[in-house]
Amino acid sequence: MQQNEKASLNTSAAAAKAGSYTGYADVYDFWYYHQRGDGLTVNGKPSYTTDKAVSEGLTRPHTTWNGDNVFGKAANLTYSFLNTFSSTPNGHTGPVKFTPVQMQQAKLSLQSWADAANLTFTEVSPNQKANITFANYTRNADGSLNTDTQAYAAYPGTHPVSGSAWFNYNQSSIRNPDTDEYGRHSFTHEIGHALGLSHPAEYNAGEGDISYKNSAAYAEDSRQFSIMSYWEVENTGGDFKGHYSAGPLMDDIAAIQKLYGANMTTRTGDTVYGFNSNTDRDFYTATNSSKALVFSVWDAGGTDTFDFSGYSNNQRINLNEGSFSDVGGLKGNVSIAHGVTIENAIGGSGNDILIGNGADNILQGGAGDDVLYGSTGADTLTGGAGRDIFVYGSGQDSTVSAYDWITDFQTGIDKIDLSAFRNEGQLSFVQDQFTGKGQEVMLQWDAANSTTNLWLHEAGHSSVDFLVRIVGQTAQSDIIV
């Protein structure tokens, strides 16, 4: 949605909510879900935009494998799995070589960072010098078993331990990162450090009384926005039901792209995320309805689709960059990185809300009572079974030169919601022609093609420039005015 249409959402909200129930009210509430920046204070903390979270949070070390304060330059890096070591930088001992399962999961974590930024990773043998090294430890410096720590890593640099990543093999999640999501999450987190990313604020495990309340410098410091954060998603209104991300999230993607540049070769074709995924990435793929998805999308091109058709939960799906969606029974678990356009969305069998963007979207609600809002662009909207509402927020949403199609309208069951136009005056219906006074709606039935044209002449406009084309016949009682 363009900025002036966002303003239209603001000015129309009160008018829409003043009447009977409207789908527009749902769209408005969802549109401002996780609004950030703009001088907001959330949880008693300043709200940061992604750019500010990157500059003042995640990239505070100002270091990359290309040198200090060298940003936006690609890096070709090596990595290895150490056979042994005498002690870690923190004095831990008891080396255990990475298992084949750990190696596989670490490589998947490396791949997720390379998808987002201009990074390549080449494995070398344990006796060769590598930029990033992986090893397990088991004991403290005094020889006692270490059961307290999880993992840690060093930033890039020229020191012998630079880029080293260390993992506590006594932790079940570290031993079994293929079945325990927190293990894979930890691998990706520590690799983030080895690439130059910090925690979003000045805190580390084991250093003082740290918590979201005490330690987070800004509101969005949680595992909903960044895999580099320590803090649970509930602090920022999310609910992952105990699940963890495997790849970098919205703010991480922006941060790693600041350090090494955006990878513009990643998924440039027509990519499907969720069910029927062709991403070849496990965390973007749902194979059944019990699969919990937690991800942020980086996608460099093509005509792309969010397919969440296999879920029966009520879902809220937003295709705008920088947005969050509630998918598969979780809250705020799917996001779209800045600079990404996802064109299409498919809902499931619950009562879903789908919001499009400025592209020519294809939105499919599926079964259930759905609310579809295409926003600007020439959109194709299919409600599916159930009592669906097709929402329009301003005259820009469906113009004479770029009109929407509603493909399966059921008269007497579905609704078209024009309540957002109330802020310009009450709408009225005309039969055969407009009077010129504005705020008039006309339905034009085309019997030969079994379609209806919905025209709207807005107040203050010299000509009629709003048009929606509908497959099937539509009555005045189907329109919310």
From Swiss-Prot:
Residues 1-15 form a propeptide. GO terms for cellular component: extracellular matrix; extracellular space. Binds 7 Ca(2+) ions per subunit. Binds 1 zinc ion per subunit. Ca(2+) 4 binds at residues 357, 359, 361, 374, 379. Its EC number is 3.4.24.40. Ca(2+) 7 binds at residues 384, 386, 388, 414. It catalyses: Preferential cleavage of bonds with hydrophobic residues in P1'. Keywords: Calcium, Hydrolase, Metal-binding, Metalloprotease, Protease, Repeat, Secreted, Zinc, Zymogen. It is found in: Secreted. It comes from the Bacteria. It is an enzyme of class 3 (hydrolase). Ca(2+) 1 binds at residues 267, 269, 271, 299, 301, 304. Zn(2+) binds at residues 189, 193, 230. SMART domains: ZnMc. The active site is at 190. The keyword Repeat applies. The Gly-rich repeats may be important in the extracellular secretion of this metalloprotease. Belongs to the peptidase M10B family. This is Serralysin B. It comes from Dickeya chrysanthemi.
